[in-house]
Design a protein with these regions (language model features):
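Class I S-adenosyl-L-methionine
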Residues: 1-105, 202-203, 215
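Short hydrophobic alpha-helical segments that form membrane-spanning helices or hydrophobic packing faces
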Residues: 15-17, 110-113, 167
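A broad, structure-centric signal for solvent-exposed, well-ordered loop/edge residues
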Residues: 12, 21-22, 53-56, 112, ...
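Short, solvent-exposed amphipathic alpha-helical segments in soluble enzyme
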Residues: 18-22, 41, 88-91, 117-118, ...
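Short, well-ordered alpha-helical microsegments
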Residues: 37-38, 108, 164-165
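A contiguous loop/helix-start segment that scaffolds small-molecule binding in enzyme catalytic cores
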Residues: 2, 66-71, 127, 135, ...
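Class I SAM-dependent methyltransferase SAM-binding "motif I" and its flanking Rossmann-like core
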Residues: 78-81, 86-151, 193-196
Length: 225
């Protein structure tokens, strides 16, 4: 059996009870070393998937399964959001290896807690958009930032803080320039940091803070007073 476990946003206490039990009892653990807090995996035998190909990951899973043992594939946050698990699940189906997915606390939820904000407010917005800028992974034309911004809903942008100036400029095509923005770096980790501003000045503030990755960009009037 292979379990895909969402490890939460970073704080080891955000790992679910079920996820902790599976990790504690696993024979083999595969995780991305740069993304998952090592404290989650104390006293475990692990493979760091950061330098492994999909084929290498599957080979470890096959070997463990052949021995009648259990593999836990640990993903940061929740595996269903930018977790790239579909190709692994499809491959396991072809190999006849049973699997299940255990949800985790996503970084966008930890970010809301860190900011002590609510994404959905009466008379402000009842919609939350989770998205990312296009890069190595393309984005459908209908889901480009300029199109999504037209809703002027709460928007949470993953994997894009390294292009914050371009991001803010593109959002200003639909959001007012004074729309509040908060960038949350490593939500729930000890080094967590929050940078606030507007679509006009957030890029300068984020660059001054030296934040280039591992941060969420949150946009919308939910951040207002």
């Amino acid at each position: 059996m292979v379990y895909f476990v969402g490890a939460g946003a970073g704080d080891p206490e955000l790992l679910t009870v079920k996820g902790k039990r599976l990790i504690d009892n696993a024979d083999t653990i595969i995780y991305a070393g740069s993304l998952v807090n090592p404290a989650v995996l104390e006293d475990c035998q692990v493979y760091d998937s950061a330098g492994m190909t999909l084929e290498e990951v599957l080979a470890v899973m096959q070997e463990t399964e052949a021995q009648g043992k259990t593999t836990v594939r640990v993903h940061t946050g929740d595996a269903s959001i930018y977790g790239a698990i579909r190709e692994q699940l499809d491959a396991l189906d072809k190999l006849g290896i049973p699997h299940t997915v255990v949800p985790g606390v996503s970084s966008f939820l930890a970010a809301a807690a860190a900011m002590q904000k609510e994404y959905t407010l009466p008379d402000v917005t009842q919609t939350v958009i989770l998205t990312r800028m296009e890069g190595r992974t393309p984005v459908p034309e209908r889901e480009r930032l300029e199109e999504l911004a037209k809703h002027r809903a709460t928007m949470i942008i993953f994997l894009s803080v390294g292009r914050i100036a371009e991001l803010a400029e593109r959002l200003r095509t639909a959001y007012p320039a004074a729309t509040p923005v908060a960038v949350v770096y490593k939500a729930s980790w000890p080094e967590e940091k929050i940078v606030t501003g507007t679509l006009l000045d957030i890029a300068e503030k984020v660059q001054a803070a030296g934040i280039t990755k591992t941060a969420l960009v949150t946009v919308g009037e939910f951040l207002g007073d």
